[in-house]
Amino acid sequence: MNVSDLLNILNELLHPEYFSDYGPNGLQVGNAQTAIRKVAVAVTADLATIEKAIACEANVLLVHHGIFWKGMPYSITGILYQRMQRLMEGNIQLIAYHLPLDAHTTIGNNWKVARDLGWEQLESFGSSQPSLGVKGVFPEMEVHDFISQLSAYYQTPVLAKALGGKKRVSSAALISGGAYREISEAKNQQVDCFITGNFDEPAWSLAHELAIHFLAFGHTATEKVGPKALAQYLKGAGLESVVFLDTDNPF
């Protein structure tokens, strides 16, 4: 299998054409005709991850966060130069899929969590189109028990919480990554909790004034889910050597 074949698989699975994204989805650096030796899957194409990909002898790095974003300067200098230099020195083809991997209803960063935790009556959630997140219901429990359940799933303690809602909860909305502003939409949808990755100062007041729980588990932790699931998917799609590269990024 070559990189072009892999791109066909990924495009058919993730449908990037449906999304107006913040950066290019698909092959960002490399040659589409390269024969695949080993695929490394990760959250972000930072220098540490690129070095890990080189060390494990991968020649394809597939990530959620690539190295090109809208509004970047055209010049290739500084950190961007260093990353591209190591990619090319290691003969690594870089592939990235951003919003399509958030939104996928089976292996995405949001829907997979809801399915794994047994939420029911699942519906798309979020103000963007297509929607990136998911909402659902679950058996009523104490909010602190719900937080513990999520912490165990994400394998990290909650980084920020604003408990503005009721003591017992039975519904939630989830958008991974930097979606704290969607708390207002969560209230509009009448769920008990809103879960995301990042947090910022307004979230505290909004949670209490809207009478909803706000829970943030970190951008990285909430966006490992999709890449891990994608790695497993590719193993079943004919790729013999696929690894997930973890990171110790707590943000």
Curated annotation (Swiss-Prot):
A divalent metal cation 2 binds at residues 65, 219, 223. GO terms for molecular function: metal ion binding. InterPro entries: DUF34/NIF3, DUF34/NIF3_sf. Keywords: Metal-binding. One of its GO terms (cellular component) is cytoplasm. Pfam families: DUF34_NIF3. A divalent metal cation 1 binds at residues 64, 102, 223. NCBIfam families: YbgI_SA1388. PANTHER family: GTP CYCLOHYDROLASE 1 TYPE 2 HOMOLOG, NGG1 INTERACTING FACTOR 3. Homohexamer. Belongs to the GTP cyclohydrolase I type 2/NIF3 family. This is GTP cyclohydrolase 1 type 2 homolog. It comes from Chlamydia trachomatis serovar D (strain ATCC VR-885 / DSM 19411 / UW-3/Cx). The lineage of its organism: Bacteria, Pseudomonadati, Chlamydiota, Chlamydiia, Chlamydiales.
